[in-house]
């Protein structure tokens, strides 16, 4: 497996929190925090893929690399595929890691962990999950659950993803973390597929891959990164990063 390439899709047109990549957290735009965490993961070069000059400028001011992509992509995966061809047209990287641009508190170690399942040649896409401990999250449709079976230490093979409380019965429930490591060929296949029936019903694009027979494995991690989607999330991220600076 070649050194992975980390790509961070970032766009300003978020519905619930417009311009969130540029939101100030401890004096630094959020996208810069995410870029720094990705660099600290130490698994390969990091590039921000954006449709906005302002985002590219703040990354380049930090000495990072940003590429401009089309503004009309239907999903972050499509933006990822375009950025990959811009950054690496010769195919030197056969793995691409998609780190969402709204995870300013993410632990670099779990970014590094995301590629581990790809050591198995049967795995097409790798991702992350964490055990759900808070009872209210078990029935929360905004907390996506992964249903899978154990295939190795702290590793599941995904059988389904759902917004419902599942699976039934005794045992842990797992919160899916939307960070993906794709084999390059798997990403190209994925973005070429039409939307799947379950994908449209659950509004979860990873179901497209499962419906097409692709294999997704997930590493179980301890740290659940905070996704910033609302003003309340932004305030929580500011608090968490302020505490880290004090420590």
Swiss-Prot record:
Q: Which domain of life is it from?
A: Bacteria
Subcellular location per UniProt equals:
Cytoplasm
Which keywords describe this protein according to UniProt? Cytoplasm, Lipopolysaccharide biosynthesis, Nucleotidyltransferase, Transferase
Reactions catalysed, semicolon-separated, are: 3-deoxy-alpha-D-manno-oct-2-ulosonate + CTP = CMP-3-deoxy-beta-D-manno-octulosonate + diphosphate
Biological or metabolic pathway of the protein: Nucleotide-sugar biosynthesis; CMP-3-deoxy-D-manno-octulosonate biosynthesis; CMP-3-deoxy-D-manno-octulosonate from 3-deoxy-D-manno-octulosonate and CTP: step 1/1; Bacterial outer membrane biogenesis; lipopolysaccharide biosynthesis
**Molecular function terms from GO:** 3-deoxy-manno-octulosonate cytidylyltransferase activity
Q: Which CDD domains match?
A: CMP-KDO-Synthetase
UniProt xrefs under Pfam families:
CTP_transf_3
Which EC number applies? 2.7.7.38
In this entry, which stretches build a coiled coil? none
Q: GO CC terms on record?
A: cytosol
Protein task: Activates KDO (a required 8-carbon sugar) for incorporation into bacterial lipopolysaccharide in Gram-negative bacteria.
**Entry's family note:** Belongs to the KdsB family.
HAMAP family, A to Z? KdsB
Full protein name: 3-deoxy-manno-octulosonate cytidylyltransferase
Q: What is the lineage of its organism?
A: Bacteria, Pseudomonadati, Pseudomonadota, Alphaproteobacteria, Hyphomicrobiales
């Amino acid at each position: 497996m070649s050194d992975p390439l980390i790509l961070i899709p970032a766009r300003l047109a978020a519905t619930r929190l417009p311009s969130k990549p540029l939101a100030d957290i401890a004096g630094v735009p959020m996208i810069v925090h995410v870029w720094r965490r990705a660099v600290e993961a130490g698994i390969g070069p990091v590039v921000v893929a954006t449709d906005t000059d302002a985002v590219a400028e703040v990354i380049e001011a930090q000495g990072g690399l940003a590429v401009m992509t089309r503004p009309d992509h239907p999903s972050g995966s499509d933006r990822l595929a375009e950025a990959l061809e811009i950054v690496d047209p010769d195919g030197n990287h056969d793995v691409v890691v998609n780190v969402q641009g709204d995870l300013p508190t993410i632990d670099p170690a779990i970014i590094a962990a995301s590629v581990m399942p790809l050591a198995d040649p049967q795995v097409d896409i790798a991702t992350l999950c964490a055990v759900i401990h808070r009872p209210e999250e078990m029935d929360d449709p905004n907390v996506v659950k992964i249903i899978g079976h154990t295939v190795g230490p702290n590793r599941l093979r995904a059988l389904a993803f759902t917004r419902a409380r599942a699976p039934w019965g005794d045992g842990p429930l797992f919160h899916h973390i939307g960070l993906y490591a794709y084999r390059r060929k798997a990403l190209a296949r994925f973005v070429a597929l039409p939307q799947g029936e379950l994908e449209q019903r659950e509004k979860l694009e990873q179901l497209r891959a499962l419906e097409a027979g692709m294999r997704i494995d997930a590493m179980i991690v301890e740290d659940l990164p905070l996704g910033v989607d609302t003003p309340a999330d932004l305030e929580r991220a500011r608090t968490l990063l302020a505490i880290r600076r004090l420590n």
